[in-house]
Amino acid sequence: GSSGSGKSTMLKCVNLLVPIDEGSILLDGADITASGVNANQVREEMGIVFQAFNLFPHMTVLDNVTLSPRKVHGVRKAQAEDKARELLAGFGLSDKVDEYPDRLSGGEQQRVAVIRALATEPELMLFDEVTSALDPELVAEVLNVIRALKDEGMTMVIATHEMGFARDVADQVCFLDEGRILEHGPPKQIFSAPSEARTKQFLQRIIDAGRL
């Protein structure tokens, strides 16, 4: 959807940061918006990555990645560091373990942000326009990380303006407009045969801009 259509708000609703007005949100078949649900416990099942990298500038890459597992989940320091090093190596950042964020490129910082979210071993990953703050040449770095997560079977909800990426990676695509899910379905349906006039208009503008 276009800017202001409600993509970020939807992700915040899934993460229980914004209350929903009606309906329900199911995670593993359980309604996480039901009365009495512990929001903090639900959030422990999710990882979320925003547009801004939000790394702690006074901490090394290793400390950024291990902070939540240690402080929130009670993982022993040695175990958390072993897991962090494994993740960093898997995403080509093993040589950045002791670096501080200001020594990293934007693409590297965003990859560390993704790894930090993965370090808590979430059931669900939420991505909110994670490439929008990156130079175009760095976008592929982060998109390749998300592709790798898909190949590993990670469940993800992604808000993105990278239409070609969404078409290639998604199992289901939702088009949002003015705070509503106007249309949803498999990528082939949404991108090749959308039923709503607003969806068609949006996609045509993307095509005209050479972004699809």
Protein language model features and the residues they cover:
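ABC family nucleotide-binding domain
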Residues: G1-E178, L182-P187
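C-terminal boundary and immediately downstream tail of ABC-type ATPase nucleotide-binding domains
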Residues: H184, K188-L212
